[in-house]
Amino acid sequence: MRTEPELDRRVLVDLLRDRYALDIERLDFIPLGIDSWSYAAVRSDSSRVFVKLVRPAVVGATPRGAELPLLAALAEVGRVSVARPLPDRAGRLMSAVGGYEIAVLEYLEGRSLEDEATWPDALYGRVAEAVAAIHASTDAVRHLVPRVERFELPFLTSFARTLAALQAGRPVADDEAMPIELRDLVGPRAVELQAGIERLTDLRDGARTRGRRQVAEEVLCHTDLWGSNLLLADDGTLHVLDWDGALLGPPEHDLFMFAGTGFFPAERLGWFLDRYEAAFRPVRLSADLLAFYLYRRSFEDLAGFVRDLAEGTADAMGAVETLGIVASIIDDVLRLEERVLHVREILRDRA
Protein backbone atom coordinates (compact mmCIF):
# COMPACT_ATOMS: atom_id res chain seq x y z
CA MET A 1 0.00 0.00 0.00
CA ARG A 2 1.04 3.59 -0.59
CA THR A 3 -0.15 4.83 2.80
CA GLU A 4 0.54 3.45 6.27
CA PRO A 5 -1.89 1.09 8.00
CA GLU A 6 -4.16 2.31 10.79
CA LEU A 7 -1.90 0.89 13.47
CA ASP A 8 0.16 2.83 16.00
CA ARG A 9 3.83 2.22 15.29
CA ARG A 10 4.48 1.79 19.01
CA VAL A 11 2.12 -1.20 19.06
CA LEU A 12 4.13 -2.80 16.27
CA VAL A 13 7.46 -2.08 17.97
CA ASP A 14 6.15 -3.61 21.21
CA LEU A 15 4.98 -6.73 19.36
CA LEU A 16 8.38 -7.17 17.71
CA ARG A 17 10.06 -6.87 21.10
CA ASP A 18 7.71 -9.07 23.09
CA ARG A 19 7.03 -11.84 20.54
CA TYR A 20 10.18 -11.82 18.41
CA ALA A 21 12.83 -10.58 20.85
CA LEU A 22 13.73 -7.82 18.40
CA ASP A 23 14.98 -4.51 19.76
CA ILE A 24 13.64 -2.09 17.16
CA GLU A 25 14.82 1.51 17.14
CA ARG A 26 13.02 2.70 14.02
CA LEU A 27 10.33 1.64 11.56
CA ASP A 28 10.71 2.85 7.97
CA PHE A 29 7.51 2.52 5.96
CA ILE A 30 7.94 1.11 2.43
CA PRO A 31 5.19 2.55 0.16
CA LEU A 32 4.92 -0.40 -2.23
CA GLY A 33 2.38 -3.15 -2.81
CA ILE A 34 -1.35 -3.27 -3.43
CA ASP A 35 -2.85 -5.45 -0.69
CA SER A 36 -0.23 -5.36 2.06
CA TRP A 37 1.82 -2.91 4.12
CA SER A 38 5.57 -3.14 4.58
CA TYR A 39 8.18 -1.77 6.97
CA ALA A 40 11.93 -2.03 7.28
CA ALA A 41 12.46 -2.44 11.02
CA VAL A 42 15.89 -1.12 12.06
CA ARG A 43 17.45 -2.80 15.08
CA SER A 44 19.82 -1.26 17.63
CA ASP A 45 22.81 -2.81 15.83
CA SER A 46 21.64 -1.17 12.54
CA SER A 47 20.62 -4.52 11.02
CA ARG A 48 17.11 -4.73 9.59
CA VAL A 49 14.20 -7.12 9.29
CA PHE A 50 11.27 -6.91 6.90
CA VAL A 51 7.80 -6.64 8.44
CA LYS A 52 4.71 -7.34 6.32
CA LEU A 53 1.15 -6.60 7.45
CA VAL A 54 -2.01 -7.95 5.82
CA ARG A 55 -5.69 -8.01 6.67
CA PRO A 56 -7.04 -11.42 7.76
CA ALA A 57 -8.22 -13.64 4.92
CA VAL A 58 -11.93 -13.85 4.20
CA VAL A 59 -13.75 -17.01 5.22
CA GLY A 60 -13.00 -19.85 2.81
CA ALA A 61 -9.86 -18.25 1.37
CA THR A 62 -6.33 -19.58 1.78
CA PRO A 63 -5.16 -18.58 5.29
CA ARG A 64 -2.68 -15.73 5.51
CA GLY A 65 0.87 -16.96 5.91
CA ALA A 66 0.18 -20.33 4.29
CA GLU A 67 3.19 -19.70 2.05
CA LEU A 68 5.66 -19.12 4.92
CA PRO A 69 6.66 -22.79 5.48
CA LEU A 70 7.24 -22.98 1.72
CA LEU A 71 9.49 -19.92 1.90
CA ALA A 72 11.50 -21.46 4.71
CA ALA A 73 11.99 -24.62 2.64
CA LEU A 74 12.94 -22.69 -0.50
CA ALA A 75 15.55 -20.80 1.51
CA GLU A 76 17.02 -24.16 2.56
CA VAL A 77 16.94 -25.60 -0.97
CA GLY A 78 18.78 -22.53 -2.22
CA ARG A 79 17.86 -22.64 -5.91
CA VAL A 80 16.03 -19.31 -5.77
CA SER A 81 16.76 -16.37 -3.47
CA VAL A 82 13.86 -15.68 -1.10
CA ALA A 83 13.38 -13.93 2.24
CA ARG A 84 13.50 -16.49 5.03
CA PRO A 85 10.60 -16.06 7.50
CA LEU A 86 11.58 -15.52 11.13
CA PRO A 87 9.56 -17.36 13.81
CA ASP A 88 8.38 -15.72 17.01
CA ARG A 89 9.34 -16.98 20.47
CA ALA A 90 6.71 -19.74 20.21
CA GLY A 91 7.91 -20.88 16.78
CA ARG A 92 4.98 -19.36 14.89
CA LEU A 93 5.52 -17.65 11.56
CA MET A 94 2.51 -15.30 11.84
CA SER A 95 1.30 -12.96 14.56
CA ALA A 96 -1.81 -10.81 14.87
CA VAL A 97 -2.40 -7.39 16.38
CA GLY A 98 -4.87 -4.55 15.89
CA GLY A 99 -6.81 -6.22 13.08
CA TYR A 100 -3.70 -7.10 11.07
CA GLU A 101 -1.73 -10.29 10.58
CA ILE A 102 2.03 -9.88 10.61
CA ALA A 103 4.99 -11.78 9.21
CA VAL A 104 8.64 -10.98 9.93
CA LEU A 105 11.25 -11.95 7.36
CA GLU A 106 14.90 -11.51 6.58
CA TYR A 107 15.62 -8.14 5.02
CA LEU A 108 16.95 -8.49 1.49
CA GLU A 109 19.06 -5.68 0.07
CA GLY A 110 18.40 -4.47 -3.45
CA ARG A 111 16.25 -2.22 -5.58
CA SER A 112 12.69 -3.00 -6.59
CA LEU A 113 12.12 -3.38 -10.32
CA GLU A 114 8.53 -2.09 -10.11
CA ASP A 115 9.24 1.28 -11.70
CA GLU A 116 11.91 0.18 -14.18
CA ALA A 117 10.76 1.36 -17.61
CA THR A 118 13.08 -0.85 -19.67
CA TRP A 119 15.17 -3.84 -18.71
CA PRO A 120 18.40 -4.92 -20.40
CA ASP A 121 18.53 -8.39 -21.93
CA ALA A 122 20.97 -9.54 -19.24
CA LEU A 123 18.34 -8.82 -16.59
CA TYR A 124 15.59 -10.60 -18.52
CA GLY A 125 17.95 -13.55 -18.85
CA ARG A 126 18.39 -13.56 -15.09
CA VAL A 127 14.60 -13.51 -14.66
CA ALA A 128 14.32 -16.52 -17.01
CA GLU A 129 16.84 -18.36 -14.84
CA ALA A 130 14.86 -17.42 -11.71
CA VAL A 131 11.64 -18.82 -13.20
CA ALA A 132 13.53 -22.00 -14.11
CA ALA A 133 14.91 -22.23 -10.56
CA ILE A 134 11.41 -21.92 -9.09
CA HIS A 135 10.05 -24.68 -11.32
CA ALA A 136 13.10 -26.88 -10.68
CA SER A 137 12.46 -26.65 -6.92
CA THR A 138 9.11 -28.42 -7.21
CA ASP A 139 10.04 -31.91 -6.00
CA ALA A 140 11.82 -30.60 -2.90
CA VAL A 141 8.89 -28.46 -1.69
CA ARG A 142 5.79 -30.01 -3.27
CA HIS A 143 4.36 -31.07 0.10
CA LEU A 144 4.46 -27.46 1.36
CA VAL A 145 2.76 -25.74 -1.57
CA PRO A 146 -0.55 -24.45 -0.16
CA ARG A 147 -2.72 -24.60 -3.29
CA VAL A 148 -3.25 -26.40 -6.60
CA GLU A 149 -4.43 -24.64 -9.76
CA ARG A 150 -8.18 -25.17 -10.31
CA PHE A 151 -8.59 -22.70 -13.18
CA GLU A 152 -11.21 -20.78 -11.23
CA LEU A 153 -12.73 -17.38 -12.04
CA PRO A 154 -14.16 -16.27 -8.68
CA PHE A 155 -14.32 -12.61 -9.69
CA LEU A 156 -16.27 -13.09 -12.90
CA THR A 157 -19.90 -13.27 -11.71
CA SER A 158 -19.60 -10.06 -9.72
CA PHE A 159 -17.74 -8.29 -12.52
CA ALA A 160 -20.34 -9.30 -15.12
CA ARG A 161 -23.05 -7.87 -12.85
CA THR A 162 -21.10 -4.64 -12.37
CA LEU A 163 -20.47 -4.41 -16.12
CA ALA A 164 -24.19 -4.73 -16.83
CA ALA A 165 -24.92 -1.99 -14.29
CA LEU A 166 -22.31 0.29 -15.86
CA GLN A 167 -23.72 -0.32 -19.32
CA ALA A 168 -27.22 0.56 -18.11
CA GLY A 169 -26.09 3.47 -15.93
CA ARG A 170 -27.47 1.82 -12.79
CA PRO A 171 -25.80 1.84 -9.36
CA VAL A 172 -24.00 -1.36 -8.43
CA ALA A 173 -26.02 -1.52 -5.20
CA ASP A 174 -29.19 0.25 -4.09
CA ASP A 175 -27.34 2.59 -1.74
CA GLU A 176 -24.49 3.49 -4.09
CA ALA A 177 -24.23 6.13 -6.78
CA MET A 178 -22.51 5.08 -9.99
CA PRO A 179 -19.41 7.23 -10.57
CA ILE A 180 -20.07 9.11 -13.80
CA GLU A 181 -16.44 8.87 -14.91
CA LEU A 182 -16.48 5.10 -14.51
CA ARG A 183 -19.76 4.73 -16.39
CA ASP A 184 -18.48 6.91 -19.24
CA LEU A 185 -15.23 4.96 -19.42
CA VAL A 186 -16.54 1.40 -19.23
CA GLY A 187 -20.08 1.67 -20.61
CA PRO A 188 -19.15 2.24 -24.28
CA ARG A 189 -16.79 -0.77 -24.19
CA ALA A 190 -19.20 -3.10 -22.38
CA VAL A 191 -20.14 -5.17 -25.44
CA GLU A 192 -16.49 -5.80 -26.31
CA LEU A 193 -15.71 -6.64 -22.69
CA GLN A 194 -18.62 -9.10 -22.59
CA ALA A 195 -17.14 -10.83 -25.64
CA GLY A 196 -13.83 -11.01 -23.78
CA ILE A 197 -15.58 -12.62 -20.81
CA GLU A 198 -17.07 -15.28 -23.09
CA ARG A 199 -13.63 -15.93 -24.56
CA LEU A 200 -12.18 -16.28 -21.07
CA THR A 201 -14.81 -18.80 -19.97
CA ASP A 202 -14.19 -20.88 -23.12
CA LEU A 203 -10.45 -20.86 -22.41
CA ARG A 204 -11.16 -21.85 -18.79
CA ASP A 205 -13.21 -24.85 -19.88
CA GLY A 206 -10.41 -25.98 -22.17
CA ALA A 207 -7.79 -25.45 -19.46
CA ARG A 208 -9.71 -27.63 -17.02
CA THR A 209 -9.94 -30.45 -19.56
CA ARG A 210 -6.24 -30.22 -20.34
CA GLY A 211 -5.35 -29.92 -16.65
CA ARG A 212 -7.06 -33.20 -15.77
CA ARG A 213 -4.98 -34.97 -18.42
CA GLN A 214 -1.59 -33.49 -17.50
CA VAL A 215 -1.33 -33.31 -13.71
CA ALA A 216 2.18 -34.79 -13.95
CA GLU A 217 3.39 -31.54 -15.55
CA GLU A 218 2.56 -29.43 -12.49
CA VAL A 219 5.38 -27.29 -11.13
CA LEU A 220 5.76 -24.83 -8.30
CA CYS A 221 4.44 -21.52 -9.64
CA HIS A 222 4.97 -18.11 -8.06
CA THR A 223 2.04 -16.72 -10.14
CA ASP A 224 2.98 -13.02 -9.89
CA LEU A 225 6.44 -12.58 -11.34
CA TRP A 226 6.58 -8.93 -12.22
CA GLY A 227 8.73 -5.97 -11.25
CA SER A 228 7.32 -5.22 -7.80
CA ASN A 229 8.05 -8.78 -6.69
CA LEU A 230 11.64 -8.79 -7.93
CA LEU A 231 14.54 -7.21 -6.07
CA LEU A 232 17.92 -6.78 -7.75
CA ALA A 233 20.93 -6.74 -5.43
CA ASP A 234 24.17 -4.89 -6.19
CA ASP A 235 25.95 -8.21 -6.75
CA GLY A 236 23.42 -9.21 -9.42
CA THR A 237 21.39 -11.58 -7.23
CA LEU A 238 17.70 -11.53 -8.11
CA HIS A 239 15.47 -11.96 -5.06
CA VAL A 240 11.88 -13.16 -5.56
CA LEU A 241 9.33 -11.68 -3.14
CA ASP A 242 5.66 -12.11 -2.17
CA TRP A 243 4.85 -15.80 -2.43
CA ASP A 244 1.28 -15.67 -1.11
CA GLY A 245 -0.06 -16.73 -4.54
CA ALA A 246 2.19 -19.78 -4.85
CA LEU A 247 0.57 -22.97 -6.11
CA LEU A 248 1.15 -26.16 -8.07
CA GLY A 249 0.14 -25.63 -11.67
CA PRO A 250 1.28 -25.71 -15.28
CA PRO A 251 4.46 -23.78 -16.11
CA GLU A 252 2.32 -21.50 -18.28
CA HIS A 253 1.05 -19.88 -15.08
CA ASP A 254 4.41 -18.15 -14.63
CA LEU A 255 5.47 -17.99 -18.26
CA PHE A 256 2.41 -16.06 -19.44
CA MET A 257 3.99 -12.93 -17.96
CA PHE A 258 6.51 -13.16 -20.81
CA ALA A 259 3.94 -13.92 -23.53
CA GLY A 260 2.67 -10.42 -24.16
CA THR A 261 2.06 -8.29 -21.09
CA GLY A 262 3.22 -4.75 -20.39
CA PHE A 263 6.04 -6.53 -18.61
CA PHE A 264 7.43 -8.25 -21.72
CA PRO A 265 6.51 -8.11 -25.44
CA ALA A 266 4.87 -11.17 -27.01
CA GLU A 267 7.26 -11.28 -29.95
CA ARG A 268 10.18 -11.99 -27.59
CA LEU A 269 8.61 -15.03 -25.94
CA GLY A 270 10.84 -17.40 -27.91
CA TRP A 271 13.96 -15.56 -26.76
CA PHE A 272 12.83 -15.86 -23.14
CA LEU A 273 11.93 -19.55 -23.48
CA ASP A 274 15.38 -20.34 -24.89
CA ARG A 275 16.96 -19.09 -21.68
CA TYR A 276 14.32 -20.63 -19.43
CA GLU A 277 14.68 -24.08 -21.00
CA ALA A 278 18.49 -23.90 -20.91
CA ALA A 279 18.29 -23.40 -17.14
CA PHE A 280 15.42 -25.88 -16.54
CA ARG A 281 14.49 -28.40 -19.23
CA PRO A 282 12.55 -28.42 -22.51
CA VAL A 283 8.81 -27.89 -21.99
CA ARG A 284 5.87 -28.31 -24.33
CA LEU A 285 3.64 -25.29 -23.82
CA SER A 286 0.00 -24.76 -24.74
CA ALA A 287 -0.94 -21.55 -26.55
CA ASP A 288 -4.48 -21.92 -25.19
CA LEU A 289 -3.21 -22.11 -21.62
CA LEU A 290 -1.04 -19.05 -22.10
CA ALA A 291 -4.08 -17.30 -23.58
CA PHE A 292 -6.17 -18.33 -20.57
CA TYR A 293 -3.67 -16.78 -18.16
CA LEU A 294 -3.35 -13.62 -20.23
CA TYR A 295 -7.13 -13.20 -20.25
CA ARG A 296 -7.63 -14.19 -16.62
CA ARG A 297 -4.99 -11.84 -15.26
CA SER A 298 -6.31 -8.92 -17.30
CA PHE A 299 -9.94 -9.46 -16.30
CA GLU A 300 -9.08 -10.18 -12.67
CA ASP A 301 -7.16 -6.91 -12.41
CA LEU A 302 -9.89 -5.03 -14.27
CA ALA A 303 -12.62 -6.49 -12.06
CA GLY A 304 -10.79 -5.48 -8.88
CA PHE A 305 -10.17 -1.89 -9.91
CA VAL A 306 -13.69 -1.43 -11.33
CA ARG A 307 -15.17 -2.81 -8.11
CA ASP A 308 -13.11 -0.39 -6.01
CA LEU A 309 -14.31 2.55 -8.08
CA ALA A 310 -17.93 1.42 -8.23
CA GLU A 311 -18.06 0.84 -4.48
CA GLY A 312 -16.04 3.93 -3.56
CA THR A 313 -13.20 1.97 -1.96
CA ALA A 314 -10.30 3.11 -4.19
CA ASP A 315 -8.67 5.02 -1.33
CA ALA A 316 -5.19 3.50 -1.42
CA MET A 317 -4.33 4.82 -4.89
CA GLY A 318 -7.04 7.42 -5.35
CA ALA A 319 -9.92 7.47 -7.82
CA VAL A 320 -8.12 9.43 -10.56
CA GLU A 321 -5.12 7.10 -10.65
CA THR A 322 -7.38 4.05 -10.52
CA LEU A 323 -9.46 5.34 -13.45
CA GLY A 324 -6.26 5.66 -15.46
CA ILE A 325 -5.35 2.07 -14.63
CA VAL A 326 -8.82 0.87 -15.68
CA ALA A 327 -8.51 2.68 -19.02
CA SER A 328 -5.11 1.11 -19.63
CA ILE A 329 -6.32 -2.41 -18.77
CA ILE A 330 -9.35 -2.07 -21.06
CA ASP A 331 -7.08 -1.08 -23.94
CA ASP A 332 -4.89 -4.11 -23.19
CA VAL A 333 -7.87 -6.48 -22.99
CA LEU A 334 -9.11 -5.43 -26.40
CA ARG A 335 -5.69 -6.24 -27.90
CA LEU A 336 -5.26 -9.63 -26.25
CA GLU A 337 -6.07 -11.66 -29.35
CA GLU A 338 -3.22 -9.98 -31.23
CA ARG A 339 -0.86 -11.19 -28.52
CA VAL A 340 -2.33 -14.67 -28.51
CA LEU A 341 -1.74 -14.86 -32.26
CA HIS A 342 1.94 -13.96 -31.72
CA VAL A 343 2.16 -16.68 -29.06
CA ARG A 344 0.66 -19.33 -31.37
CA GLU A 345 3.10 -18.47 -34.13
CA ILE A 346 6.10 -18.59 -31.80
CA LEU A 347 5.11 -21.93 -30.25
CA ARG A 348 4.37 -23.42 -33.67
CA ASP A 349 7.84 -22.42 -34.89
CA ARG A 350 9.40 -24.02 -31.79
CA ALA A 351 7.57 -27.33 -32.16
Predicted features and spans:
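Juxta-kinase regulatory segment immediately upstream of eukaryotic protein kinase catalytic domains
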Residues: 1-27
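Protein kinase glycine-rich loop
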Residues: 28-32
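Active-site acidic catalytic loop and adjacent metal/ATP-binding pocket
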Residues: 34-45, 50-51, 85, 198-255
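ATP-binding pocket architecture of kinase catalytic cores
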Residues: 44-146
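A glycine-centered beta->alpha junction motif in the catalytic cores
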Residues: 56, 102-116, 165-179, 299-317
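A cross-family kinase active-site recognition segment
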Residues: 117-188, 218
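ATP/Mg2+ or Mg2+-diphosphate-binding catalytic cores
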Residues: 170, 179, 271, 303-351
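Active-site activation/catalytic loop segments of kinase-like enzymes and analogous catalytic loops
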Residues: 251-282, 295-313
